[in-house]
UniProtKB/Swiss-Prot annotation:
Residues at the site labelled Transition state stabilizer: 179, 240
Protein residues bound to ATP: 16, 207-211, 282-284, 333-337
Protein role: Catalyzes the formation of acetyl phosphate from acetate and ATP. Can also catalyze the reverse reaction.
Known cofactor(s): Mg(2+); Mn(2+)
Protein name as it appears in the record: Acetate kinase
Pathways involved: Metabolic intermediate biosynthesis; acetyl-CoA biosynthesis; acetyl-CoA from acetate: step 1/2
Record organism: Haemophilus influenzae (strain PittEE)
SUPFAM superfamilies according to UniProt: Actin-like ATPase domain
Keywords, in A-Z order: ATP-binding, Cytoplasm, Kinase, Magnesium, Metal-binding, Nucleotide-binding, Transferase
Gene: ackA
Subcellular location: Cytoplasm
GO cellular component terms listed in the entry, alphabetical order: cytosol
Documented EC number(s): 2.7.2.1
Catalyzed reactions: acetate + ATP = acetyl phosphate + ADP
A GO biological process held by the record: acetate metabolic process
Length: 401
């Protein structure tokens, strides 16, 4: 068996894992451990096409999950074929512009960047430490892949906020972006789709899932993106508000008497599609009930969501200026599967000569890629499934094999 990469994506209460062959992209194992610290902590997986699941025990967390993977899921042959471990890291700050092998200095850098990703980075560090314990022979073969790295090619005019400059110089307050691993992968997919070298492609990439972001790529490099200092800025998301007037925070605090903790919870966990529908963060509810007169919240939510998305796409078309836009790409759970969202958003952009093909748009769902605009559309829009795990596996292999 060829050299394989174990991929870990640790959240505060979950662990997503996979084993890939970086040379072929073949997935040997995939799974999710979730409900950490709760009585119902559990793990589910698919190994060589066969599914399995198990209870981890009340209160189980990352340690128990990784030990279970190593002891109960992996065959000896598969375990011996793991040659390196790749970790997804949400925030690397300004310091990390590419993937690196884990060292004490790198761990310190991830800790320092945790102020901008307080829910994610500490969980990633737990994953790294537990991977060291579960696979001690691979301690020097752990690689971290940063979601912020792809966006570090932005210029000051794109990443600076109009705040006192000292806040940036002394405290790192600036735009960092997120979903960079996905944006990088899709930029390369667009290049292949339109028949251009990766370093010559110009694209607008819409990664739409429970979290969502848009990036604009010129000559294969990111020049702007919608998420900011944290993943709260930008698009309407599942539970996150995206762009708002910052003075709303003062209003909630001073006039409504909300605490800063309550305000943070509202903006991060109670807004977005959940806030607009006051029912659910699931985009499918808004789609399924869009024309249901008894559920006006569905149309309201989907219209706001799509309008915000269209504004970003239009703005980034302007940012490209004279550079020809090769394609607008949709990816992520919503981007790949919601023909309705794509249609609503692109219909706002008819001024640019974009014409959606309804039949193609409906066909490009559920894992199927494809162009969704007409042949005479001024610009192509394409649906492309993302594969962040493959990027992590390939970067890990590049540094370790």
């Amino acid at each position: 068996m060829s050299k394989l990469v174990l991929i870990l994506n640790c959240g505060s209460s979950s662990l997503k894992f996979a084993i890939l062959d970086p040379a072929t992209g073949e997935e040997k194992l995939s799974g999710l451990a979730e409900a950490f610290f709760l009585p119902e902590a559990r793990i589910k997986w698919k190994l060589n096409g066969e599914k399995g699941n198990a209870d981890l025990g009340a209160g189980a967390a990352h340690t128990e999950a990784l030990n279970f993977i190593a002891s109960n899921i992996l065959t000896d042959e598969l375990k011996n074929s793991i040659a390196a471990i790749g970790h997804r890291i949400v925030h690397g700050g300004e310091k990390y512009t590419q993937s690196v092998i884990v060292t004490d200095e790198v761990v310190k850098g991830i800790e320092d960047a945790a102020q901008f990703a307080p829910l994610h980075n500490p969980a990633h560090l737990i994953g790294i430490r537990e991977a060291f314990n579960a696979f001690p022979h691979l301690k020097d073969k752990n690689v971290v892949v940063f979601d912020t790295a792809f966006h570090q090619t932005m210029s000051e005019e794109a990443f600076l906020y109009a705040l006192p400059y000292s806040l940036y110089k002394e405290h790192g307050v600036r735009r960092y972006g997120a979903h960079g691993t996905s944006h990088y992968f899709i930029s390369r997919e667009v290049a292949e789709y339109v028949g251009k070298p990766a370093d010559q492609v110009n694209a607008i990439i819409c990664h739409l899932g429970n979290g969502g972001s848009v990036s604009v790529v010129r000559n294969g490099q990111c020049i702007d993106t919608s998420m900011g200092l944290t993943p709260l800025e930008g698009l309407v998301m599942g539970t996150r508000c995206g762009d708002i007037d910052p003075a709303i925070i003062f209003y909630l605090y001073k006039t409504l008497g909300m605490s800063m903790e309550q305000i943070e919870e509202t903006l991060v966990k109670k807004s977005g599609l959940l806030g607009l529908t006051e029912v659910t963060s699931d985009c499918r509810y808004a789609e399924d009930n869009y024309d249901n007169a008894s559920k006006p919240e569905a149309k309201r939510a989907l219209n706001v969501y799509s309008y915000r998305l269209a504004k970003y796409i239009g703005a980034y078309m302007a940012v490209l200026g004279d550079d020809h836009l090769d394609a607008i790409a949709f990816t992520g759970g919503i981007g790949e599967n919601s023909a309705h969202v794509r249609e609503l958003a692109l219909n706002h952009l008819k001024l640019f000569g974009i014409q959606i093909d309804n039949e193609r748009n409906l066909a490009a769902r559920f894992g199927k890629d494809g162009v969704i605009t007409t042949d005479d559309s001024a610009f192509k829009a394409i649906v492309l499934p993302t594969n962040e795990e493959l990027v992590i596996a390939q970067d890990t292999a590049r540094l370790c094999f």
